Amino acid sequence: MQKTRIFKYIPVLVFLIVALFASCAHKSGHKENPCRTTTVSNRTEKQNSSRNKRVVNKRSTEKLEGQEIFERYGDAVFMVFTSDGSNAYQGSGFFINNNGLAVSNYHVFKGTGIGMEQIKLLGDDTAYNISQIIQKSEECDFILFKVECSNNNYIPIASLKPKVGEKIYAIGSPRGLENTFSSGEVSQWRAQNLMQISALIDHGSSGGALINEYGEVVGITSGSFADGSQANLNYAWSIDVVKPYL
């Protein structure tokens, strides 16, 4: 899935999916994340925007209903706008702490101009800049970065991966429809860090948050089939691919 314009599709055959993504799966035990990553030095900050304080939510000890998930974390997910100098693109992203630390898909940013990215928060017309790219991996399709804002809402990170059949919720901006909410289950793990999900996602959802019933982020929504069959086959990367760099 992509920035609205160039949707990154997951290969149709399962064995190709595994071959493509298994190389960045965690090994058992406590070994380092084998995803090839790149650390990028700080950028010069261009803008120091002040924002109103947002309510910061903590992990729930009980299962939450879908409406509670969205009420708590809807404004922790944002739209990402990028450009290659000629074309404009749109994707999604989300905060994982209250000081602007955020996650999205690498392919949302790939090939775009440094310094041309902007973030739009729900209910806020201000355009926020990215001050630092901390880590990125094309193989595991994630990018970890810092947005020039603070006191933002965020989604706590899950300590455990969801099991097949567990309820999950996706928040993103498919086709520019800001902060669309959908629900489903984990359909299967196709590689150790790549899950198949039944929650609906589409162009522009790339980089959005996949959340469990306890209000914890478990994945980064990333891709879908596009073979004309209308099959509800969507994919998300486990949030575990980011954990070694936090």
Regions found by a protein language model. Name each.
Residues V77-M79, A102-N105, K161-P174, I211-G228, ...:
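Active-site-proximal beta-strands of protease catalytic cores
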Residues K53, N57-I69, V80, M116-Q118, ...:
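C-terminal cap/linker of serine protease catalytic domains
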Residues A25-K27:
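Bacterial signal peptide processing site
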Residues F94-F95, V186, L200-T221:
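Catalytic nucleophile loop of clan PA
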Residues S83-Q90, N97-T180, N193-Q196:
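Conserved active-site neighborhood of the chymotrypsin/trypsin-like protease fold
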Residues F21-S23:
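C-terminal motif of bacterial Sec signal peptides marking the signal peptidase cleavage site
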